[in-house]
UniProtKB/Swiss-Prot annotation:
Its EC number is 3.1.1.11. The keyword Transcription does not apply. One of its GO terms (cellular component) is extracellular region. GO terms for molecular function: pectinesterase activity. Keywords: Aspartyl esterase, Cell wall, Cell wall biogenesis/degradation, Glycoprotein, Hydrolase, Secreted, Signal. Acts in the modification of cell walls via demethylesterification of cell wall pectin. This is Probable pectinesterase 66. Gene3D superfamilies: Single-stranded right-handed beta-helix, Pectin lyase-like.
Length: 336
């Protein structure tokens, strides 16, 4: 009996310790140290890329790369083995990372993140190729940011381009209070992403006024069971020019606008099946509880999907991307 009691005691201790460790890991993790980037030489480095290069792989501790005021004209890449980076700027007007490149979406991006577990705050990412004054260039893909890892939180940041601005390639991503500007497919990819309180700014009427209309989103999923989708909750659609809310980059595309404000830049038809023509039944394009001059759905495409209130709420909740509670462990100031 003593052996049994001793064995049971050990089991109880192991369970208690497991619960303690789990509870500890669920709390927000701390930043191990901060690297400062300053164009004027007042920090550890003068470029963002050199700061990232200084981090030894593989990295499993949160490291903040704090970037001071300035326009950093460089391409920045976070490689796969360098996760747990908190890229923080002074604000979208103060800290700008920009570059002038175009064509292939896999090489033109100003900013690319391959790693998992990334936090970004207070930075503008810009591809200037199509948005220079008096632009006479042909409009081509020119990516501002390419997000290719899992578990990203991006707050109070801006993405600026014209065609293919934000490549939300894959993974679970949470964007809050961000501004995304562009004219053609300016949020595109296969991602599983929630956009909260963001502004989608149509600029085709500024940089390419001869184009009749643009498109905000271009999404696709590889299969009906894939959990991906772009969900815009409490967002604002505004700008200059006319636009569709989205078009299907492929079958099974899923884009949901929930309780968002749609200005008159939105065309009455709203959506385009594009590469899923003939398979419209497989698309999940949804508008729920939206307001504004562009929110009238009476002339929308006939295959616009209708979901129940509970279904929409499920997509618009943080749980859509955060089933395992990863956001609560991120070192986010003020919470997500």
């Amino acid at each position: 009996m003593k052996r049994v009691a001793s064995y049971n005691y050990k089991i109880v201790c192991m369970v208690v310790m497991t619960l303690f460790v789990y509870g500890y890991s669920a709390a927000a993790e701390q930043i191990a140290y901060t690297i400062t980037v300053d164009l004027n030489g007042g920090g550890n480095f003068t470029t963002v890329q050199s700061a990232i290069d200084s981090i030894s792989p593989p990295n499993h501790n949160w490291i903040r790369v704090f970037t001071q005021n300035g326009i950093y004209r460089e391409k920045v890449t976070i490689p796969k083995e360098k996760g747990f980076i908190y890229l923080q700027g002074k604000g979208i007007e103060q800290t700008v990372i920009e570059y002038d490149d175009h064509q292939a979406t896999d090489i033109s991006a100003t900013f690319t993140a391959f790693a998992d577990d990334i936090v970004i705050s207070g930075i503008t990412f810009k591809n200037t190729y199509n948005i220079v004054p008096n632009n006479k260039r042909e409009i081509v893909p020119a990516v501002a940011a390419r997000m290719l890892g899992d578990r990203y939180v991006v707050t109070d940041s801006s993405f600026v381009g014209l065609q293919d601005t934000l490549f939300d390639g894959k993974g679970r991503h949470y964007y809050k209070r961000c501004i995304i500007s562009g004219g053609i497919d300016f949020i595109f990819g296969y991602g599983q992403s929630l956009f909260k309180e963001c502004t989608l700014n149509m600029t085709l009427g500024i940089y390419a006024p001869d184009n009749p209309y643009g498109t905000i989103t271009a999404h696709q999923r590889p299969s009906p069971s894939d959990e991906g989708g772009f969900v815009f909750s409490d967002c604002t659609v505004t700008g200059v020019g006319k636009t569709l809310l989205g078009r299907a980059w492929g079958s099974n595309a899923r884009v949901i606008f929930d309780r968002s404000r749609l200005s008159d830049v939105v065309l009455p038809i709203g959506w385009d099946a594009w590469r899923a023509k003939g398979n419209e039944r497989d698309l999940t394009f949804v508008e729920a509880g939206c307001t504004g001059a562009g929110a009238d759905t009476s002339q929308r495409v006939p295959w616009l999907k209708k979901l129940s209130l509970s279904e929409v709420d499920g997509f618009a909740s943080v749980s859509f991307i955060d089933q395992d509670g990863w956001i609560s462990r991120f070192p986010i100031e003020g919470g997500p």
